Structure formats: structure tokens, C-alpha cells
Amino acid sequence: MPNDINKLKRIMRQANYLTNQSPANGNKAYAMRVAWEIEKIREYLRSGLVSFSYAKVNGDCRTALGTTNPLLIPATAIPKSTDLDLPRERLGLITYYDLDKDGWRSFYFYSLDRIDHVWTFNSPSTTPSTTPAGSLS
């Protein structure tokens, strides 16, 4: 139950922030929908590996293989903090560990193009399950 409350707090904080940002421009329903989508992306990243594409700030398209699951990140790359979110999640920003670049990267939610696949891991010894995720719309 406490995890559900924390999840709802994160979503409401995100929606409140997004309400006054472009492209929501005051549309609370749109901001809430986007906040739920951001939470879904973060859950995918916490559960295993995610293959996705987004537009970089310079306009280039970037395809990435990322995670925030501590079991899949090298021990030297895990931030030394007491926060459960690795690293601290900022409003409107999705942070992930890039397995191709061996480093932490981030992108703004509105630049996400698509999620190609999600591989989830229940424990380090299990075989991953794969889910084609498709578009978020």
C-alpha cells in the first residue's frame, strides 16, 4: 500500500508540473495522461531492459538500450544514495543507464518516439520475458 501511495504522489507531482508546461498548456487531463505514461516508462526501466528511440536535443534520433534496474547496472555506476530512484528523477525528465554507452543518460518525455521492446527480469537467475511495446499513444 505505501508503494501505491508513493506512486500516486509521483504521478500527481509530475502532472502538476506538466500542466503549466508545453505541450499541455494548462490542460490538466492531458498532463495527467502524460504523467501516467512517464510512470509507465519508468516502471519498464525499473523492471528490466528497454529498447526505445527518442529525439536528442540537437534533433538527431537516438536508439537506446537502457535500464534503471540495479541488478543490470555495473556496481561502479550505481549512485551512492538513499533515494530509491536511480538517480534522482527530475520532473519532465526520464533518466536511464545506457548499456550501449555505459553511462547515465536522460531525455525529456516529449522527445520519446517509441518503445520497441521491454525485457523484464524477476531475479538475476531467471530468463527474461519480452514484450513488444509499440507506440505509447
Regions found by a protein language model. Give the residues of each.
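Acidic, aromatic-enriched beta-alpha/helix-loop junctions
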Residues: 68-103
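Amphipathic alpha-helical segments in structured regions that serve as interaction surfaces
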Residues: 2-23, 31, 35
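A short, Trp-centered hydrophobic/proline-enriched beta-strand micro-motif
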Residues: 46-54
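Charged, amphipathic alpha-helical segments
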Residues: 25-40, 65, 69-82
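Nucleic-acid endonuclease domains
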Residues: 85-87, 129-137
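Short, compact, well-ordered microdomains
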Residues: 93, 97-130
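A sequence-level detector of short linear motifs
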Residues: 63-65, 106
